[in-house]
Structure formats: structure tokens, C-alpha cells
Amino acid sequence: MRYTTAGESHGPEEIAVIEGIPAGLHITQEDVNAQLARRQKGYGRGERQKIETDTVTFLTGIRHQKTLGSPITLNVHNDDHNNWSKIMAPNEPQTSENSLRKVLRPRPGHADLVGGIKYRHHDDLRNVLERSSARETTMRVAVGAVAKKLLAEIGVDVHGFVVNVGPAKSDLSTLTQYQDLEALRQVTESFETRALDAAADKAIRDVIDSTKRDANTVGGQVQVMATGVPVGLGSYISADDKLDAKIARAIVGINAFKGVQFGGGFDNAEKYGDQVMDEIFWRPEKGFYRGSDNLGGFEGGMTTGEAIVVRGVVKPIPTLYRPMQSVDIDTHQDHRASIERSDTTAVTAAAVIAEAMVAIELAKAVLDKFDADNIDRMKEQVAAYRQEVKAF
């Protein structure tokens, strides 16, 4: 399985093409739209979300709600393009009229300046920010929706939530009270902040509100969990086959993510071995299992069968309504950075995007290990493999 996305933030369309999805997977546009709606929601989002109503169109690879095994093309229309059609026009030369929204003062923390240098966009840094914008993650969430449908066929569930926004934190000790991810999902999705509890929801709202009043932005952390994952996805044979490494790359590849950890993560660096390693047990009814999950579901780059636990660090959004020091790329004179429409925080949406990326990497790993031509054959192979693992 592989995919690619295309599209600019204020261009007419966002597009994704997915290859390698087995034939016979049942999927509807509503399945994808539900995930796109989750991405748009969240406390602290900006005015763009009031303009867009993200809905997907299936262009290729799906017939009668079933995948064909051929490339799947997904399309989401940018409603805001109506306000930018002249500025983003692909078939018109640049004029004074369609250059009104030039960006010449790069934002610290954004791709503006380095992207302009790299691609020689001397005249307008909008050529950078239109693609580097997090609007592109719309299509990663759409691809993730397809991946989640595939994973659900073999009993794998994936869910993301917010750990903290600034100093306001969810109470992670409450995670033990949930029987499964569906029960957890019902709680976190009931809050606009995607927090774990009502107290954290209120605290996070307060932080976001005060940050907005200060014309500032704020970061945080999100956590993604996956259950029902077969043992042995990934490999210890080569470094680039390690599944945790692939997931780490996928998480840090999301806009504004600056760190990732598995299980106990960086806290494990302050502990001793007998406090960290997940002891091994065996029971005839379930086979091998671990007594804890401090390593986040991975050993040697392979899944252990325990819950995958991944956390990502999200930096504050670089666009500030109280802009920071910058330099005009034309005059080289000091100026305040450009201002683009932005969110106070994207952490609430980041949980959904990170969830999608974990689902994509897990789906890739499943399709690497099992039959990728037909969904029923894949399910048969996974079921047989689970029995083999249990009997080991």
C-alpha cells in the first residue's frame, strides 16, 4: 500500500491516490466524511473551518461501495477557493491584480523562508505556504479512513485523543477504566477538546481562551492507541523494516509535530530495567502475553500483540496575530512577520490526524504480511495466523 496527496491550501481541490488496497473492501463516502468532520471539529480551530464543509468524492477504484483493487482516487473540494480563484489561477500570468496577497515576510517556525530559498520563490512565499499548509492533512485523514476500514475487518481499532494543551492536562490514570477503545472514544469525542475527562476539558478550554485573548498560539501532546493488532507486524531484520520506526516517521511527518514516543517513552530513561520491561506470561486460552505495556506494543521493531501506544508532541502554530520579528525578502529590512488566517491551537485536530497516520502505517504492515489482492483472503490468512500464534 502506498499513497500520495496533491493540492494547495486555497487551490480548487485536495486529492489523494491510494494504491494497494485489496479488492472487496466495503467503504462509503460517509465512512470517510465522518473522519473528515472529526478533523474539522475541535476547540481552538479558526475561521477556515466555518467556510469549509469537507466531503469526499470517490473518483476511481470503487464500484458499488466495494474497492476494485485498482488505484483509489479521493477528492475534497476547497470551498474557500471561490475567494482565491484569481490569486491561485493556474492559467493566467501574474499581474498586479492577482498578486494582492503576496507573502514577503516569512513567519518564524513555518516553512516560508527555507522553502522560498530552496525552490527560488523570490517573488512570493505564498508558493511555499500553499502546499506546506496543514490543509493537506485533510487528505491524510481521508486515506486514514480507508486504512481504518481495512483494519476493522481484522479486529484492529485505532483512536487518538488529547493529552495536554499547554499546562492543562488529561488524567491518564483514567485510561485503565475503559474496557476497549470504543468506550474511550465515546468519552473523548464528547468533548470539543478531545480530553479524557471533564476537568481537563474545562482546563484546556480556559488555556485556549486565554491564549486567543493574548493573540498567541499554544501546543500540546496527543496520544494514539491501537488494539487487536496481530503479533509480528514489522521486522527486526533491517532498520527500515521496523514498524515503530515507520510510525515515528509518519507522526513527525505531520505538520507541527516535533517529537514522538512509544509507551512510557522518555519517562523510561529515568527508570531501571526491571521497572520498564514487560514481563512475559502464558495461558492456554490466550497464549503468550505481557503483564504490562511500558514499551507501547513493540519489541525489536515488531508488534507484541499488546496495545500500541504512541504519543506525539505538537508545537504551537507559527502564525501569530501578534507577529514576531522577521525580514522582508525583497528589501531585507526588518518587519513583523506576515499574518495568515490561523487557529489558536490545532492540537484537537492533530489527534485525529495522528490517528489516521498510525492507521495508515498499520494497514501497510498488514498488507505487507498478508494477501493484498482480496479482502476476504486477507481476513482468512489473518485468522489462521492468529491461531498459529496462539498455539506457539
UniProtKB/Swiss-Prot annotation:
GO aspect biological process, one term: aromatic amino acid family biosynthetic process
Pathway the protein contributes to: Metabolic intermediate biosynthesis; chorismate biosynthesis; chorismate from D-erythrose 4-phosphate and phosphoenolpyruvate: step 7/7
Catalytic activity: 5-O-(1-carboxyvinyl)-3-phosphoshikimate = chorismate + phosphate
InterPro entries, A to Z: Chorismate_synth, Chorismate_synth_AroC_sf, Chorismate_synthase_CS
GO CC terms, sorted: cytosol
UniProt entry tagged with the keyword Repeat: no
Pfam families, A to Z: Chorismate_synt
Binding residues annotated for NADP(+), in chain numbering: 39, 45
Similarity remark: Belongs to the chorismate synthase family.
The protein's role, per its UniProt record: This reaction introduces a second double bond into the aromatic ring system.
Subunit-level organization: Homotetramer.
Protein name as catalogued: Chorismate synthase
Gene: aroC
